[in-house]
A protein has these predicted regions:
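Acidic helix N-cap motif at the loop->helix transition within catalytic regions
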Residues: 1, 22-31, 71-72
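Catalytic-site signature of metal-activated, phosphate-bearing donor transferases
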Residues: 45-51, 58, 62, 69-233
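Short, structured coil segments at secondary-structure junctions
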Residues: 9, 31-32, 55, 140
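Short, well-formed alpha-helical segments that are part of the catalytic scaffolds
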Residues: 1-9
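A conserved acidic beta->alpha catalytic loop
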Residues: 6, 17-27, 63
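Cofactor-binding loops of NAD(P)H-dependent oxidoreductases
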Residues: 38, 62-64
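Conserved donor nucleotide-binding strand/loop of the catalytic core
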Residues: 25-53
């Protein structure tokens, strides 16, 4: 609901609902959105399917746990894209347990979310050396511009929500990998180097205990993936 409420009233909204069992679809329809129900086929496939349904010249891709701040809404309303700009990178701030994370591995984040519909391609980026398509980025042939405002990403309101997503994503990535003891050993070594890098060099400590926790958990992520893949081998 927060995500839809943040969208400008004049925008045409398309919601692709992966057969949710809560009130997501009905709430979206009440707010005037076009709702298309489509069986879940993975993150990348779902985004590509959604883009294929768009008939406007520009698309703003918004996840259910994201919302636009007031500055971004004003900037979008006044935007007049030059002909050579095919997309805009949107600064994004992720919240963890109620506070914004401004440093560390989550600090510098500005994904491409606004783009010319017919010029954008979604590129899958398998993580941790596996084949699972969990991460992606929008690619365009032209220039990528910048815009004022912030995309608010409130995906982890509690430790439980973070832990659940961490467990889910690492399991999905491990399922697309061939595990081995050498791969696990390399992942452990990399994790030991990344933790202080995220904490000190990337200034994760500036975010307090949240930054310290995320520095170590982010560093451990590939190691957990490798461990789960090794257990499956």
């Amino acid at each position: 609901v927060r995500s839809l409420a943040s969208v400008p009233n004049e925008a045409r909204v398309l919601v692709v609902d992966a057969e949710s069992t809560d009130a997501t679809a009905s709430l979206a329809r009440e707010r005037g959105a076009r709702v298309v129900v489509w069986p879940w086929a993975g993150f990348v496939a779902t985004r590509r399917y959604a883009l294929a349904l768009v008939d406007g010249p520009w698309t703003f891709m918004l996840d259910a746990d994201e919302s636009l701040d007031a500055t971004l809404r004003v900037a979008l309303a006044a935007l007049e894209p030059p002909d050579d700009v095919d997309a805009y990178a949107i600064p994004r701030t992720t919240y963890f347990c109620g506070s914004p994370i401004r440093y560390g591995t989550w600090g510098a984040d500005a994904p491409v979310r606004l783009f010319r519909t017919q010029r954008a391609t979604l590129v899958a980026e398998p993580a941790a050396g596996g084949s699972a398509e969990l991460h992606e980025r929008w690619s365009v042939p032209g220039h990528v511009g910048s815009i004022n405002g912030t995309l608010v990403h409130d995906s982890y309101p509690t430790f439980a929500s973070y832990r659940a997503k961490f467990a889910r994503y690492t399991s999905l990535e491990a399922a697309g990998m061939r595990g081995s003891a050498p791969a696990l050993a390399r992942a452990i070594a990399v994790a030991a180097l990344r933790a202080p890098w995220y904490l000190i060099v990337r200034s994760g400590w500036r975010d307090g205990w949240r930054g310290a926790f995320l520095a170590f958990s982010s560093a451990a992520y590939p190691m957990v993936v490798a461990w789960k893949a090794w257990r499956r081998a």
